[in-house]
């Protein structure tokens, strides 16, 4: 679940911020360090207030309060996009074997098709591809350069 991070200010004359709060700083407690927030700028996320340095990914520790960052909150964990997708990302099906691809698995992608690494091989000769190898995508089949002519000829007969 993705959550918005709101940047707040205690300065009523500061125009660029999203919203100005008229709350005495002593009443705000940081959701991370549990200390009072006396900073001019602070964040609001997951129904709590945060020092800018305290709102961070629970796994990798990257700051989530930076401009353009998204906060993902699931199972009580604050996560950056990368870690969220690594843990809970969308599973899919391999275009070759139709078996499940887990979110953390390494894959090969060709256009809108996704393949397990072990399934990313020539449909004709079963040779696994190396970096720089040329191939053609025919429907969901990947065919190496050497087998393109035979593969298309064989499929035309079917």
Swiss-Prot record:
CDD domains: LIM1_LMO2, LIM2_LMO2. GO terms for molecular function: metal ion binding. It holds the Pfam family LIM. One of its GO terms (biological process) is erythrocyte differentiation. Residues 28-90, 92-154 form the LIM zinc-binding domain. Keywords: Developmental protein, LIM domain, Metal-binding, Nucleus, Repeat, Zinc. SMART domains: LIM (SM00132). Its main location: nucleus. It is found in: Nucleus. GO terms for cellular component: nucleus; protein-containing complex. Transcription factor that acts synergistically with tal1/scl and gata1 to specify embryonic dorsal mesoderm to a hematopoietic fate. Induces globin gene expression together with fgf. This is Rhombotin-2. The gene is lmo2.
């Amino acid at each position: 679940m993705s959550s918005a991070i709101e940047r707040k200010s205690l300065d009523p004359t500061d125009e660029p911020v999203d919203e100005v709060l008229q709350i005495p700083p002593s009443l705000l407690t940081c959701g991370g360090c549990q200390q009072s927030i006396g900073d001019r700028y602070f964040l609001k996320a997951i129904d709590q207030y945060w020092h800018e340095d305290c709102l961070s990914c629970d796994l990798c520790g990257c700051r989530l309060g930076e401009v353009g960052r998204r906060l993902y909150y699931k199972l009580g964990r604050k996560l950056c996009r990368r870690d969220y997708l690594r843990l809970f990302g969308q599973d899919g099906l391999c275009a070759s074997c139709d078996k499940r691809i887990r979110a953390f698995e390494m894959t090969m992608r060709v256009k809108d098709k996704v393949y397990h690494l072990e399934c990313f091989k020539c449909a004709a000769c079963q040779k696994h591809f190396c970096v720089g190898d040329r191939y053609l995508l025919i429907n969901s089949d990947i065919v190496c350069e050497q087998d393109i002519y035979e593969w298309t000829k064989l499929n035309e007969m079917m």
